[in-house]
Design a protein with these regions (language model features):
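Canonical Rossmann dinucleotide-binding motif of NAD(H)/NADP(H)-dependent dehydrogenases/reductases
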Residues: 2-34
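Active-site-adjacent segment of SDR/Rossmann-fold oxidoreductases
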Residues: 29, 128, 168-178
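The beta1-alpha1 cofactor-binding region of Rossmann-like NAD(H)/NADP(H)-dependent oxidoreductases
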Residues: 40-41, 61-72, 104
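Substrate-binding pocket helix/loop in short-chain dehydrogenase/reductase
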Residues: 98-99, 106-108
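Active-site helix of classical SDR
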Residues: 122, 158
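Residue(s) in the substrate-gating loop at a strand-loop-helix junction
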Residues: 143
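SDR active-site lid
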Residues: 175-250
Length: 282
C-alpha cells in the first residue's frame, strides 16, 4: 500500500505506547484513524492530542478479549468512515511468569488479549477490507519474544502464535491484494509492565505479586531497565508506516536480539544435521 493518505485505519491498544505511536504515524501520513482501547480516559486523551494536529481521528472503547466488543468497534468504524483499509492488531498485555507460577486466569487473559483478539480482528476486519476492492494491509504486533523464548511462557506462546498466524496469513491474503506484516519489537518505552491496571474482573488472579528475590526479581529489573532505555513509540510508529507502504513481512525495532535469533536457528539446523544421511524407517 504505497499511498496511505485518505485510507482508513483501525488500531487497537491505541491509547498509549506503540499503538498511539502507530496511530500518530498513520494520521500524519494522511490516514483516517479509529483509535481503540480498553482504557477509556487515556483513549479520549489520545484522540484529543491527535485532533489538535488536525488529524481525522475518532475513538471507540473495546475490550478486545471479547469478540462481541471488537465486532461492535468494527461496526462503529464503518458507521464513522464507511471503509477500512488498514487493521493494526496491537493491543497486548505482559502475561505470566515461568513454570510454577502459572494460573488458569493468567493464561486466559494473556492468550485472550495477545492472540485470540488478533484472530478475531482478522476474522472481523478481513472481509471489510476485501469488500471494497481497494486493497489493504494488516499489521499484528507480536514481539521479539515471538522469535526467542524467555521466562514469561504464556507471553511467549501468545507472541509465537501471532508470528505464525501472520506468516500463514500473508500467503493467504496476497492474491487478494492485502498485505500482512508482523511487528516484533524489542524494548520500547511503554507501560506494558503495568498491564494489570486494565485487568477485567473475569480474569481475577491472572497477575501474581512480583517476587522481590531470586531470578524473577533480577529478570524484572532487567526488563524495567530495558524498557526505560527502549525506543520511542513514535519511532516504532514510523517503522510500521514504512512497513505498510513497502509490504515488509517482518518489522523490527532494533538489532539488539539479532544474534539470539541466529543462535536459535543455528540450534534448529543442528537438529537436522544430527539425522542427516539417515533413512527414515517407513
Amino acid at each position: 500500500m504505497k499511498d496511505i493518505a485518505g485510507k482508513t485505519a483501525f488500531v487497537t491498544g491505541a491509547a498509549s505506547g506503540i499503538g498511539l505511536g502507530i496511530a500518530t504515524a498513520l494520521a500524519q501520513a494522511g490516514a483516517k484513524v479509529m483509535l481503540c482501547d480498553i482504557e477509556e480516559a487515556a483513549l479520549k486523551t489520545a484522540r484529543a492530542q491527535l485532533e489538535a494536529t488536525n488529524a481525522d481521528v475518532d475513538c471507540v472503547r473495546a475490550d478486545v478479549s471479547l469478540k462481541g466488543e471488537l465486532k461492535a468497534a468494527a461496526e462503529a468504524t464503518i458507521a464513522r468512515y464507511g471503509k477500512v483499509h488498514i487493521l493494526v492488531n496491537n493491543a497486548g498485555v505482559g502475561g505470566s511468569g515461568p513454570y510454577g507460577t502459572w494460573t488458569d486466569a493468567g493464561w486466559a487473559w494473556t492468550m485472550g488479549v495477545n492472540l485470540h483478539a488478533v484472530v478475531w480482528g482478522i476474522e472481523i476486519f478481513g472481509p471489510l477490507i476485501e469488500s471494497h476492492g481497494e486493497g489493504g494491509h494488516i499489521v499484528s504486533t507480536a514481539s521479539i519474544a515471538g522469535l526467542i523464548s524467555g521466562n514469561s511462557i504464556a507471553y511467549n506462546v501468545s507472541k509465537y502464535g501471532v508470528v505464525a498466524l501472520s506468516e500463514g496469513l500473508r500467503n493467504d491474503l496476497a492474491p487478494r491484494g492485502i498485505g500482512v506484516s508482523v511487528l516484533c519489537p524489542s524494548f520500547v518505552r511503554t507501560n506494558i509492565l503495568s498491564s494489570a491496571r486494565n485487568l477485567p474482573p473475569r480474569f481475577a488472579g491472572a497477575v501474581q505479586p512480583p517476587r522481590t528475590d531470586g531470578p524473577m526479581s533480577q529478570r524484572l529489573k532487567t526488563v524495567t531497565e530495558g524498557l526505560a532505555r527502549g525506543a520511542d513509540p513514535r519511532y516504532v510508529g514510523e517503522l510500521v508506516r514504512e512497513g505498510i507502504e513497502n509490504d515488509w513481512p517482518y518489522i523490527f525495532t532494533d538489532t539488539e536480539f539479532e544474534r539470539h535469533i541466529e543462535a536459535r536457528f543455528a540450534a534448529i539446523k543442528q537438529g537436522f544435521d544430527r539425522i542427516r544421511g539417515r533413512t527414515p524407517v517407513r
